[in-house]
């Protein structure tokens, strides 16, 4: 392992495996999740083309700690993978989607000793609901900020 430096990786993305497994089971919002080669997942939103596969360190938050150690880094700030923010979903489904994604992200980093920190995501179709989710993520979950897409459907 490299000597630990006082560095923080401030730009990382991930999608918790348990979130994708839950969506695969429930088909939340009509989203399809299929197994991909190598243990990953392919997500398809209703009416959209399948996304590129999510696999490896994108899904495995324990692997991230090993990667940080190998880089001599102290912490990593993770935002949900932009491809799965769920902006394609109608407002009600989108709010459930981001709430479950934010909760799963916090569960995934809980055992990291605060070496992994998280940004929330928000569904932007209903600004008041997005503001409530941001407040919940900051005050109840302890997320450090939020990451939103720059290109919205429609």
Predicted regions, residues:
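Helix-coil boundary/capping segments in enzymes
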Residues: 1-154
């Amino acid at each position: 392992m490299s000597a630990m430096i006082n560095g923080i990786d401030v730009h990382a993305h991930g999608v918790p495996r348990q979130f994708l497994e839950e969506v695969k089971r429930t088909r939340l919002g009509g989203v399809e999740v299929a197994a991909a080669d190598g243990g990953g997942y392919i997500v398809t939103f209703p009416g959209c083309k399948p996304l590129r596969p999510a696999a490896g360190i994108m899904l495995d938050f324990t692997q991230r700690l090993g990667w940080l150690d190998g880089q001599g880094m102290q912490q990593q700030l993770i935002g949900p993978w932009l491809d799965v923010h769920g902006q394609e979903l109608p407002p009600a489904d989108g709010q459930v989607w981001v709430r479950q994604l934010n909760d799963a992200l916090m569960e995934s980093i809980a055992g990291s000793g605060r070496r992994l920190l998280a940004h929330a995501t928000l569904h932007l179709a209903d600004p008041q609901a997005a503001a409530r989710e941001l407040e919940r993520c900051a005050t109840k979950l302890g997320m450090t900020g939020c990451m939103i897409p720059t290109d919205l459907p429609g």
